[in-house]
Amino acid sequence: MVHFTAEEKNAITTIWGKVNVEETGGEALGRLLVVYPWTQRFFDSFGNLSSASAILGNPKVKAHGKKVLTSFGDAVKNLDNLKGTFSKLSELHCDKLHVDPENFRLLGNVLVIVMAAHFNKEFTPEVQAAFQKLVTGVANALAHKYH
């Protein structure tokens, strides 16, 4: 179980309250698909993923990115129960979708990069550390059913 200090919780909730889920989600998922192209195999139904511009402009990538980040928002609301929060999604990704759990870690790292770009000076090293802890906790919660 991940334990967050009061300062970490405050940093996470303060920044998360400013996140544009649609924009940030689409960009994070898009970057994942560009930077780690083998992850595209899970998104065959998304159409044209042939180039960075095609991926970043793809409405299905943007829509799914929003869906992913909306789920991530559940983590922010349930910082003390990440495993429980992601139990059903872990089961879905393990049993039905067969997603390599390493992809959750990759997406978390990409999300931190995107947020750093969006929030610039507000995304201090302390805020980054709190979010890195959160994305690691979410990745572990999503990978829970794999063990």
UniProtKB/Swiss-Prot annotation:
Name of the molecule in the record: Hemoglobin subunit epsilon
Alphabetical keyword list: Heme, Iron, Metal-binding, Oxygen transport, Phosphoprotein, Transport
Subunit comment: Heterotetramer of two alpha chains and two epsilon chains in early embryonic hemoglobin Gower-2; two zeta chains and two epsilon chains in early embryonic hemoglobin Gower-1.
Modified residues (Phosphoserine): 51
GO cellular component: blood microparticle; haptoglobin-hemoglobin complex; hemoglobin complex
Keyword tRNA-binding: no
A GO MF label: heme binding
Signal sequence segment: none
Tissue: Red blood cells.
A Pfam family annotated for this UniProt entry: Globin
Binding locations of heme b: 64, 93
Main function: The epsilon chain is a beta-type chain of early mammalian embryonic hemoglobin.
Similarity comment: family membership: Belongs to the globin family.
Gene3D superfamilies: Globins
Domain Globin, residue spans: 3-147
GO biological process: one example: hydrogen peroxide catabolic process
